[in-house]
Amino acid sequence: MPLFQTVAQAVAEVGDKFPLNGYVFQDMKGAETRYGYQEVARLTSQRAAAMQRMGLRKGDRVGLVVIEPEDFVLTFLAAVRIGVVPVPLYPPLSFGALDAYADRTRKVLGLSQARVLFASEKLQNVLWSLVDAVPTLERLVCVETLRDAQGAATFPPIEPEDIAFLQYTSGSTADPKGVVVTHASLIANCHAIIVQGLEKGKGDGVAVSWLPLYHDMGLIGFVIATITHGMTSVFIPTMRFIKKPSVWMDAIHRHRGTVSFAPNFAYALVSRKCTEEELASWDLSCMEAFGCGAEPIHPDTARGFIELFSTRARMDPRAFLPAYGMAEATLAISFKPLRETFRTRVIDLELFQETGTARDPRDGALTLEHVSCGPTFEDHEVAAFGDSGERLPEGVEGELRLRGPSVCRGYYNNPEATDAAFRDGWLHTGDLGYVLDGEVYVTGRLKDLIILNGRNVHPQAIEWVVGSVPGVRQGNVVAFSRPGRDSEELVVVLETKELDHDTLKTEVARAVRKELGVPPADVVCLSPGNLPKTSSGKLQRRKTRSQYLTGELGRDGTRTMGASGDAITVARHMARSLWSRAKASVLGA
């Protein structure tokens, strides 16, 4: 039985149950500020009172573009306590694609009908123009001004079926869709994660995270799941981790962390970047769960991380915990069982490509390896379905569908998208995979599947092979198909720092042909930072394919990381923002 019925109730009462636990926030230099949960209740009440003085009421939507974890968490929870619905938005990653960023942010604020945008002070000169661009948006508020808020809020009744917040999807190929996350689905999923998955729930355990808080894994997993179960949570600024990955393990070591989650790339990055001295200084025997999800899990990455940190930093090798989840299921769907060994299944590649059946390999056959994401949580069910809607037997690949109390209500003000994804009593995930011996194996995305000469080829398998070729930036490879004369052809796009592209292309083509029996028709080499990515760092295959087909791939305007940007574009956005800000001041907004 969950401790609380709503997140609002948890924020108000958890400090009385677990007075010694709370949130710890690091700044970019590593200095830490700690708030016990009783202090969190007081601070969020003050911020909520300030929101009510602005005229915000239960059911209103507000945007959050907040860089600092402390301001984000306290403002988010303040809104939730009074029934104001937060809409988390990512900050601009660079000025290289500012037009696209402003367009998406405008769309999300418009679709959610947000009344107020809370933003970090350093972003205001770029964001103020949105006040004019979004009809419902009344003002932009510097989130730092809420630090001095006084008074106590008046708390309306919050029910389990009330909306807690809206989680907007990346929207790389269409308008973003706002997943409606209720208090009921949050409480159900957080209970499944903490109690069933991690065997916690009585204030025990310490969570450590560097994940962005505007995405579901960071927000639900480390802000909401922890406070609803009285756990302490330590927050590292995302950019601090990106600049120096070892700060993640430092924080776990010092705080005696027990749980942390990250995508596959982070485990590869920290394994690559940590030094011998750092490894020798860490004692990670405290860790019970190094969760891995949000993107395909590479078996070699997992094995490398387990080997390095179990032998050099005293980590329990069973702590590595593959997981499966998605925003429409609130967050998590399945976990590898705690204290069990990480498992994979090696199958016959040709048989799988031709029939979709996962079977042991025949003698001499090419093979494919899939990571088990464990069984689904109690009261939840995952099954694979075929193209005609038939439920498939175990070990046969199809679209994964889910049902259970963690499934969200639908998409905000988008009945067409809701009806397409939430129907027949199931959430249609769009993911490909199979269930075998009660465990979930995720093989890819339905829309990304490549069909070559009648064989189903998963882009992840190609990308992993290419990523192992010396000179290729691991985790920065995209595979897709293009129209050929008689059938689809394979294209591989990669990032590299190498100057000899011709030799690298030859090596890539040879590796793919040898390991998977599929010859690429084209291999494209890009300099670092040119592959399209989402705000959470996920590669965008369909956008990459679209840019490839239109000849836009690799142009300066499409750079996603490390771009300096077009000075004219930046100046234009700042001028619009300054004009909007001046006009609002004159009008008294």
What are these regions (language model features)?
Residues 53, 81-150, 263-264, 269, ...:
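Structural core segment of the AMP-binding/adenylate-forming
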Residues 288-290, 297-439, 447-449:
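Conserved AMP-binding/adenylate-forming
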Residues 9-35, 164-166, 173, 325, ...:
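AMP-dependent adenylate-forming
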Residues 187-206, 216-258, 273-278:
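Conserved AMP-binding/adenylation subdomain of ANL enzymes
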Residues 253, 260, 404, 409-410, ...:
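AMP-binding/adenylate-forming catalytic core of the ANL superfamily
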Residues 19-21, 150-168, 174-175, 180, ...:
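Conserved pre-ATP/AMP-binding loop-to-beta segment of ANL
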Residues 476, 514-539, 552-566:
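AMP-binding/adenylate-forming catalytic domain of the ANL superfamily
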Residues 23-69, 73-77, 94-103, 155-157, ...:
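Conserved AMP-binding/adenylate-forming core of the ANL superfamily
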